[in-house]
Design a protein with these regions (language model features):
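N-terminal, active-site-proximal structural segment of metallo-dependent hydrolase catalytic domains
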Residues: 1-81, 233-268
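Structured beta-strand-rich core segments of catalytic domains in phosphoester-bond hydrolases
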Residues: 2-25, 29, 48, 66-134, ...
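Active-site beta-strand/loop signature of hydrolases that rely on acidic residues for catalysis
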Residues: 37-44, 55-77, 136-139, 155-178, ...
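Short, flexible loop segments at the rims of nucleotide/cofactor-binding pockets, characterized by
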Residues: 42-49, 114-118, 140-145
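Conserved beta strand-loop-helix elements of the APE1-like EEP
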Residues: 95-110, 131, 195-210, 230-232
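Internal catalytic-core helix/loop-beta-alpha segment
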Residues: 118-159
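Metal-dependent phosphoesterases centered on the DNase I-like endonuclease/exonuclease/phosphatase
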Residues: 145-212, 217-218, 239-268
Length: 268
């Protein structure tokens, strides 16, 4: 039986650390790899699945840079009041649920809602977010191979060269999209794994490296959350110091944003 975690109070905001040029230079000279961007994706199962308390517990546990949700109801929008951060919801036409994104830092640009080829019953949309370094599409695709592939073609046509498509793919076989690789975890993600192992939740990526991935334990939903750590593939010919300075700036920016809303830094 699932026991919802107790209420979580918002921590006192703290001052974001100043980013001094000397800090950037020191970190750049270390020339480590660009920091991986942590994305968690979870199908919440509408009203009968994960509640806002379960989503809060996931945020507190995983500290994602971006949380993607499918079958999110209007009630999930209270995340901003409960844990801070930034939230965008794209309801499916005529439905009580839709797609949602949460981030501890401001979205570089507002997420776009894109209409998809749809079946007779459910009209599908996807959310597209441009992070600057790469694009992210949050999807809950239709059953049926032909319609599924048409939806994927529509989605990737509007994505930048570096991009990731995450969410509930609703397919059992391979998701074939030219130029994209399936970089998500390989373990089953659906509750029917005792009967039939289904890997419905996936991440396809282009121009990105997946540093790590995982399937998280099951909660009250029939889907398990998936986690991927993505970073852009290095550009040929870019000076090492410039790569290091960009990576250092990104690390310090995220640390400052997390300090403002009281989340722990997962890289520490």
């Amino acid at each position: 039986m699932h026991h919802a975690p107790g209420p979580i109070t918002n921590p006192e905001p703290t001052e974001a650390p100043d980013i001094a040029p000397s800090d950037l230079l020191k970190a750049a000279l270390n020339d480590g790899p660009a920091p991986a961007f942590k994305i968690v994706s979870w199908n919440l199962l509408r009203r009968v699945g994960a509640a806002i308390e379960d989503v809060i517990a996931l945020i507190e546990q995983e500290s994602p840079d971006l949380l993607l949700m499918q079958e999110a109801t209007r009630a999930i929008g209270f995340l901003k009041e409960r844990v801070g951060g930034h939230y965008a919801w794209a309801p499916l036409p005529g439905r009580i649920h839709g797609l949602a994104m949460w981030s501890p830092t401001p979205f570089p640009t507002p997420p776009r809602t894109v209409s998809l080829p749809s079946g007779a019953v459910v009209h599908r949309v996807c959310q597209v977010l441009d992070l600057g370094t790469f694009g992210v599409a949050n999807v809950h695709l239709s059953h049926g191979q032909m319609l599924n592939r048409r939806q994927l073609r529509r989605i990737v046509a509007g994505l930048p060269p570096r991009a990731a498509v995450l969410g509930d793919y609703n397919i059992v076989g391979p998701a074939l999209v030219p130029g994209f690789r399936d970089v998500g975890p390989r373990r089953p993600t659906h509750a029917m794994i005792e009967v039939l192992p289904l890997r419905l939740d996936r991440c396809l990526a282009r121009g990105l490296v997946c540093r790590d991935s995982a399937v998280l334990p099951r909660g009250p939903s029939d889907h398990r959350p998936i986690v991927v750590h993505l970073s852009p593939e290095p550009e040929a010919g870019q000076p090492r110091t410039l790569r290091g300075m960009a990576a250092a700036a990104e690390r310090l920016r995220r640390a400052g944003a997390r300090a403002r809303i009281g989340l722990r830094d997962p890289e520490r």
